[in-house]
Design a protein with these regions (language model features):
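C-terminal amphipathic alpha-helical "assembly" element
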Residues: 54, 60, 64-73, 185-187, ...
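Periplasmic binding protein-like
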Residues: 42, 62-117, 154
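Structured segments of extracytoplasmic/periplasmic soluble domains
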Residues: 28-35, 62-69, 83-87, 112-115, ...
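Bilobed periplasmic-binding protein-like "clamshell/Venus-flytrap" ligand-binding domains
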Residues: 2, 32-49, 91-97, 102, ...
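Append "and occasionally in soluble cytosolic enzymes with long acidic Gly/Pro-rich linkers
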Residues: 1-61, 65, 129-134, 138, ...
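Acidic, amphipathic alpha-helical patches
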Residues: 25, 80, 151
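Short, solvent-exposed loop/beta-turn-alpha elements that line the ligand-binding surface or hinge
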Residues: 10-24, 34, 85-89, 110-140, ...
Length: 202
């Protein structure tokens, strides 16, 4: 996973994932004024996503290797989502997931990366309080673009800027397993929805 926009969604673009380079990370920390690292609280659920506790522990381990002390704050989903729901409550660092049934990356961009504005209904799950006027402008423009290809280009550009800002760190897409009778044709959907009319006999 290199982006929040899944393959086959409008706005998906192939992105080269950055190589794991702890020495470079240490250099960047030193350049930023943290030669000895710093301390961070990492909020994550432990029963919502597939292997979420193990993933959070792995992320914490990678951060520890470059000198960032991680206080891992794991909690059940019943507590986690109420804990992070008020966007005024600024988690330092958190792990969450998001999905979208539209097949269009624009919805993901608007919900996750648009500057949060409760009254306007923008950035509803922008839990990192990311704000970039250029990203907002591209998303606004994409909402008025009816051509899928052109809209996809706007979404991809907004995502590129957000990734370069490190607005988020993509980890993975959950993989689903389906058991299907060998007399049927079916291609699973990215949004995990299952519709009977999408099955056909061979």
């Amino acid at each position: 996973m290199n982006s929040v926009v899944p393959e086959d969604y409008v706005g998906y673009t192939e992105v080269t994932r950055e190589a794991y380079d702890p020495e470079k990370a240490k250099e960047l920390l030193a350049e930023a004024g943290y030669p000895d690292g710093f301390e961070v609280t990492f909020d994550a659920p432990n029963d919502r996503y597939m292997n979420d506790e193990q993933i959070a522990q792995a992320v914490a381990g990678y951060l520890e290797k470059v000198g960032i002390k991680v206080n891992l704050n794991l909690m059940p989903k019943a507590n986690f989502f109420s804990y992070i729901k008020p966007l005024e409550n600024k988690s330092m660092f958190l792990m969450t997931g998001w999905s979208d049934a539209s097949g269009d990356g624009l919805s993901l961009m608007h919900d996750m990366l648009y500057t949060y504005d409760r009254e306007a209904g923008n950035g509803g799950v922008n839990r990192g309080h990311y704000s970039n006027a250029q990203v907002d402008a591209l998303i606004d423009q994409a909402f008025t673009e009816m051509d899928d290809t052109k809209r996809g280009e706007l979404v991809a550009e907004a995502d590129k800027i957000a990734r370069e800002d490190y607005a988020y760190i993509p980890l993975h897409f959950e993989q689903d397993t389906y058991a299907i009778k060998d007399t049927l044709n079916y291609t699973p959907r990215m949004n995990k929805y299952v519709y009977a009319w999408e099955f056909s006999y061979k």
